[in-house]
């Protein structure tokens, strides 16, 4: 069972659709629903959202409890994972509905298996400050100099600043299936 932590963002339904197409059982719970802290799931996806991690319900408590397990943070979820481990966020010129090409990709990571199109959709106005990223978080890809993907070393915990569930990320479904298959 995949738990989707909904940060009050409509893109959560795009994530759910990809999971459904992949044949994965899932449930969706809001970020302020205390049941997200109870466990009872195999893995979790933290959805995008309109805020910052500290202002998003129980999100940081959730990351504290379940990081190191099989966890995928998308946009706000990515920022929460990075911030929990010590990185700082900074406001950037908004990239809402922008498509970028991933660069500096760590092709050794299984997240990219079978992916040949590295265009990604971006919808964010905050970014992780690269110089504050702790060594435990390995950068897997950049775009326009911004961190787009990280992995917590030795775990199945990932953060994606871009939106794999967006139509602007043609290979996003493959990326999510690769994560599910870990």
Question: Model-found features: residue ranges?
Answer:
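Catalytic beta-strand/loop cores that center a nucleophilic Ser/Cys/Thr
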Residues: 109-154
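C-terminal and late-domain segments of enzyme folds
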Residues: 136-151, 156-182
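Short beta-strand segments
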Residues: 4, 121-122, 161
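Cysteine-nucleophile active-site neighborhood
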Residues: 41-109, 119, 176
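Histidine-centered divalent metal-coordination motifs
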Residues: 75, 124, 163
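N-terminal beta1-alpha1 cap of cysteine-dependent amidohydrolase-like domains
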Residues: 1-65, 74-76, 170-171, 177-182
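Short loop/helix-cap segments at secondary-structure boundaries that form the rim of catalytic
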Residues: 20, 35-40, 81-84, 130-134, ...
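Generic structural signal for residues in well-ordered beta-strands
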Residues: 25-28, 89, 139
């Amino acid at each position: 069972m995949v738990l989707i932590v909904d940060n009050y963002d409509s893109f959560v339904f795009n994530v759910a659709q990809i999971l459904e197409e992949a044949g994965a059982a899932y449930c969706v719970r809001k970020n302020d629903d205390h049941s997200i802290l109870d466990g009872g799931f195999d893995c979790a996806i933290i959805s995008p959202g309109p805020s910052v991690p500290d202002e998003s319900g129980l999100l940081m408590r959730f990351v504290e409890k379940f990081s190191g397990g099989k966890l995928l943070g998308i946009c706000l979820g990515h920022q929460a994972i990075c911030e929990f481990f010590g990185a700082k966020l900074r406001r950037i010129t908004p990239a809402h509905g922008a498509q970028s090409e991933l660069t500096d990709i760590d092709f050794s990571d299984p997240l990219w298996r079978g992916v040949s199109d590295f265009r990604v959709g971006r919808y964010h106005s905050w970014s992780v400050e690269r110089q504050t990223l702790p060594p435990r978080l390995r950068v897997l890809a950049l775009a326009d100099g911004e961190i787009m993907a990280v992995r917590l070393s030795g775990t199945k915990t990932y953060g994606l600043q871009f939106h794999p569930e967006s139509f602007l990320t043609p290979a996003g479904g493959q990326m999510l299936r690769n994560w599910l298959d870990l």
